[in-house]
Amino acid sequence: MAFRMSEQPRTIKIYNLLAGTNEFIGEGDAYIPPHTGLPANSTDIAPPDIPAGFVAVFNSDESSWHLVEDHRGKTVYDVASGDALFISELGPLPENVTWLSPEGEFQKWNGTAWVKDTEAEKLFRIREAEETKNNLMQVASEHIAPLQDAADLEIATEEEISLLEAWKKYRVLLNRVDTSTAQDIEWPALP
């Protein structure tokens, strides 16, 4: 039934709507003075039965209710990245998400479950080993430079010459490290 103004005061059942989404939030009785309309954010049209996981949303233009999926407050996971997505709006879930959370690092979605992505883990470990190797090479070069200066100027002490040889040997051994075997690397000991 559509609301019609009246010359008489009356009390009618109304269905309250949440401003912004027009979703049903409850019902109650409203006193309607003569020659006035319904209170803001309400209708006198009863909502349909609302199944779990849905809300009733009122379309003011059509004067009708629609059932809309409601996953707000829940977390889903992007199947491409594994990133958590918090659902904060009404409507169906975004495409390419799952309710299942990835267990740990280096997981990929196989269409039905998260599985270990050994290739991604291997590449990560290789990049990590390359970064470690580069950092250690920089440390070695920083130690070698002043010692080499002293040797070139023929003012190096016996201890400096010994340290220079140790650091150069370390740098050569470090340079031979094969980072493609990332998890099995035995790093040379610092001098």
From Swiss-Prot:
<dbReference type="InterPro" id="IPR051220">
    <property type="entry name" value="TFA_Chaperone"/>
</dbReference>
<comment type="similarity">
    <text>Belongs to the tfa family.</text>
</comment>
<dbReference type="InterPro" id="IPR003458">
    <property type="entry name" value="Phage_T4_Gp38_tail_assem"/>
</dbReference>
<dbReference type="Pfam" id="PF02413">
    <property type="entry name" value="Caudo_TAP"/>
</dbReference>
<protein>
    <recommendedName>
        <fullName>Prophage tail fiber assembly protein homolog TfaQ</fullName>
    </recommendedName>
</protein>
